[in-house]
Structure formats: C-alpha cells, structure tokens
C-alpha cells in the first residue's frame, strides 16, 4: 500500500458497530487526536448500525455519504466482540470501499484505514488484507498509538511528551 503522510488537513473518522458497547477506547484516541490539532468525527448510531449490515445497498450508501460528506481521509474501525464476526464486518466494508475506488491509491479520499479489536480479530484482518490494514490489538500506550497512526512527533500533545502520568494508562481502543 502507498504511504500518505499525515497532514493537518486530514480528517479522522471512527466507526464502531452499535452492538459493541466498548466506547472508551474510541473516545480516548479521538480526544488525543483532537489534542494534536486534528479534526475527528465519531460516527453516530445511524452509521454505526448501518455498518452491521453494510452489504445492504442503502446501508453502504449511508456510510459512503458519511465518509465523503465529512471528507474523512483516515478511517478507524473498532470492534471488541466476537473475532470472526468483527473481522467479517470490517472486511465487508473494506472490500466495498475498495470496489468503489474509495482509497487514495485508487484516486479516492481514504488515505488509511485501520482496525482496533481483540488480538484474534486483528490477526484475521491482517491476514485477509495482506497487511494493508493497520491493526491495534489494544495494549498500546497513547503515544504508541499516535505514532503508529503516523502522527508527527511535533504534533504530539505536550502532556504526552513531558509527563509520565500516561505510563500506566494503557490506551486500548479497547476498554
């Protein structure tokens, strides 16, 4: 996959299927990205429930409109429940986006997509996409997560750089 460096113009979008109530991690990373100065959009329930049956045409259309309307260029997907179900849900969306030329290397908007979930789910996603999708199994430190997403060092919030109080704070897109 081509590498597209993060720029201040990038807009991050987060999707999390409604059935999964683990919102803590999504909000944590969203707030950290906002602290770095990026615009972040967290999908509302309408989008998050569409994702559960994204193979239904009107559902995909809703998700696509959400992405294009908000000019989302970095897309995160979080799912902490059943690995096979989570992988299937994510991969269906991934292939629909790909078939629709939504990725930057195809001339589309989305410069990167990543998946946060249980280690087993991450392994399936990584395997089925030949490593094209970055995965977060949920034991990363905030700083590690931001670096892994490609956030430039000078954008990292001072609180992360200067204090150790985050050290015990395991970010998971998880909890």
Model segments located where?
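Acidic-enriched, low-complexity/disordered segments with a strong bias for Aspartate over Glutamate
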Residues: 5, 10, 20, 35, ...
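Short, flexible coil/linker elements and helix-boundary hinge sites characteristic
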Residues: 3-5, 56, 71, 101, ...
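Short acidic-hydrophobic, aromatic-tinged amphipathic segments that line or gate anion-handling sites
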Residues: 133-142
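Flexible inter-domain linker/hinge segments
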Residues: 1, 142-175
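Serine/threonine-rich low-complexity intrinsically disordered regions
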Residues: 7, 50-53, 58, 82, ...
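Cofactor-cradling patches in redox/metallo enzymes
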Residues: 30, 39-132
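ATP-dependent carboxylate/acyl-activation modules
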Residues: 1-43
């Amino acid at each position: 996959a081509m590498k597209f460096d993060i720029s201040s113009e990038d807009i991050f979008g987060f999707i999390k299927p409604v059935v999964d109530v683990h919102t803590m991690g999504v909000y944590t990373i969203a707030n950290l990205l906002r602290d770095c100065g990026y615009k972040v959009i967290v999908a509302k329930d309408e989008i998050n429930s569409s994702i559960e049956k994204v193979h239904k045409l009107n559902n995909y259309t809703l998700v696509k409109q959400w992405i294009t309307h908000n000019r989302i260029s970095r897309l995160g997907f979080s799912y902490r429940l059943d690995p096979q179900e989570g992988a299937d849900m994510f991969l269906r969306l991934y292939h629909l986006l790909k078939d629709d030329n939504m990725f930057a290397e195809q001339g589309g908007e989305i410069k990167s997509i990543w998946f946060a979930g249980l280690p087993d789910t991450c392994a399936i996603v990584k395997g089925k996409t030949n490593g094209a999708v970055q995965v977060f199994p949920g034991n990363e430190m905030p700083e590690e997560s931001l670096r892994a997403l490609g956030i430039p060092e000078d954008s990292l919030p001072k609180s992360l750089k200067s204090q150790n109080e985050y050290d015990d704070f395991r970010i998971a897109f998880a909890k």
